[in-house]
Amino acid sequence: MNVFWGLVALVGGIVFLVGANSNDASQVWSIYLVNLVFWSGLAATGPAIAGMMQVTEARWSPSVRRIALTTAGFLPVAFVLFLVLFAGQTVLYPWVTKPIPSKAAWLNPPFFWLRTWLCAVVLFAVCFAFVRALLRDAIPPEDGRERARRNRIAVILLTVWLVTVSLWGFDLIMSLDPKWYSGLFGGYFAVSTLYTAFCLLSIFTIRANARGRASMPPAAVQDEAKLQFAMSILWMYFFWSQYIVIWYGNVPVETRFFVERVFVQPWMTLAWVVLIVGWLIPFAYLLKRLTGRPPQRHAPLVVVAIFGLVAIFLERVFVVFPSVSPSARLPFGPLLYGFMENARNADPARQVIMTG
């Protein structure tokens, strides 16, 4: 099976190299960027969630913390992907070949790549330091020094995570269209990444329970569902806050971004799919689930979590593609391949970190 997936990855790499040097280079690099920001965000946010649980000292979270840490296994791959992105800068970012004088202090290649790679190195290093600290033996109740040390690392991790992921939103995504800007976009990107991470955590937790690798009572799974519900609302709140301010401001350089995506096909259809699959369906189901006793069956929660993951992945497509290749059709084949290949690499069963 490993040989098979190795061959699949090899074929995918060859196809990517051919496509990156063809007339469809803009689509190929757009697909690459979508997968990069989606999966790298998930990989870094798992340890961040564990950091939140460490700082708050949630009593139900020790097993969940170890499961959340498994996403860190993808971080080395993510860093390599960040390095490869440099090769596509002239295709993705117009300001590389046509500098914008008013934004040149921030949007210039040396500074752009320095902060992108430096932030990634710092974030990934802190993630691994936190993973290493948490995977040690359990802290004795009287060992306040070790608990304080872990809390300090967790606070540093959360700070670095918020700054870095917000910068990914501003730099890697928003600068694809350097004339458009939104002060909320970095926060929106961080919140949507956090939403996907809670969706993934729900799936991993239920799967670990089913395989006997963790023992989580229904009430603990219900707590995860509450967090997933809260993040879905916060995600939509950030989107609506951003949308309504730009729409009522009616400044062409700002409204153009939404007009191209919400009122032009095929992006208009995709926008409705993201709204319904990523928010309306999860909101309706989770609202019903959270108003009663914790159910014993968790399959519907897994389905809703998958909906959330797929919706945010499509939202990344919705944001990236019109900026790079607005006339392109949706390349579902390559997108599906990239999604499945990265999902396989991010599978906790393939990571070194054990959840048992």
Feature locations, PLM:
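Membrane-interface transmembrane-helix boundary segments in multi-pass integral membrane proteins
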Residues: F185-F189, V253-I276, R297, A328-G356
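N-terminal ordered "arm"
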Residues: W5-F16, A20-S22, Q27-P47
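Transmembrane-helix bundle segments that line or gate the permeation/cavity pathway
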Residues: W29, L36-I139, L157
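A cytosolic-side transmembrane-helix exit/cap motif
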Residues: M53-V55, F204, V319-A328
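Hydrophobic alpha-helical membrane-insertion segments
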Residues: A72-A87, A230-F239, V303-E315
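Long, contiguous internal "core" modules enriched in hydrophobic/ aromatic residues
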Residues: M1-S22, W106-V274, Y285-T291
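Generic alpha-helical transmembrane segments
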Residues: F38-T45, Y195-T196, V273-W279
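Extended, compositionally biased non-globular segments
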Residues: F263-S323
